[in-house]
Amino acid sequence: MIQLRRMEKLTKRELNILEFIKKNKRASNAEIMEYLASISLGSSRITAIRGVNALIKAGLIERKGEGRSVYYEEKSTSLFLSYFDPEEYFKKSPDERNVVFERFNFGIFDNIGEIFSKSELAELKNLNDNYAERIKKLPPSIIKKEFERLTVELSWKSSQIEGNTYSLIDTEILIKENKEAEGHKREEAVMILNHKKALDYILENRKDFKNLNLRKIEDVHGLLVEGLSVAKGLRKKAVGITGTKYRPLDNEYQIKEAMEKMIEFANKKLTDPFSKAIFTTLMISYIQPFEDGNKRTSRLLGNAVLLSGDICPLSYRSINEADYKKAVILFYEQNSARFFKELFIEQFKFVVGNYFL
């Protein structure tokens, strides 16, 4: 089973215990009790132990020592999977948050361990095996229609995340009949149609994305920004991001270096397509290599990686746009992919359960 789903939300007491242990590196029951009493969250041993046990069960801390020498530490995990409660984190404004990384962290490549646990990978692979078995039994005409449906819904949601105001129905009419909706800017239609072009290109060349290179990534980006007055190729000027103090690299040479490191890491260090997909999706957003269209490129590139491994691509249809943006900002500011990973798993479950049936 996958641990710590968002519906299993930590209580205020549990969050405070976790932060106390993180801050102090280790803590005994007595120290935890004293801390809880100091912030008016209970002082009894039972209260402290209940909170500690919940954190152990969630896989966030571990018990060390024996008898009176028992203490607790944050469970050894990479910075890449550090736990943050999104609701609590985003109660503060960008200037109030404790942002660890205001600039690009080249050390991130040293902090990435196993992205998915063995049980998570087993569950994802089992879901995909079910999808693969179903698709074998479907006639080509149905497979074609399902990919068309997924294309419409991915184009709609990915564009919506970027502020596009087309409805799902209007998006379907635009893609299938090439009819633009009234009351919308031409650029919105172009953005949506470009998603279709990019996904068509990926579907036709899916095996080419088993090993990534800069040209393939630039090709996907070029298709997504065609006709939108966006320069193609790596950007040569600084960009800012709304809602965060994080500022991406502003030097073309460092941008290229970061992209090369990302590509090398993805190709040589990540053996399963799920890990490779989530890594590339986040890193393209983090590096912001292009003048515009970075997150669109990241979502399509992640799907290209999945398709190259014969894995069902994501439509993102049911994702909450605010959650998506929060997960990406958490990665910018803390280099933690944990919340984004939860969303990824949820979306994979959704797509396997709703397409190619």
Regions inferred by a protein language model and the residue ranges of each:
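FIC/Doc superfamily catalytic core
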Residues: 1-357
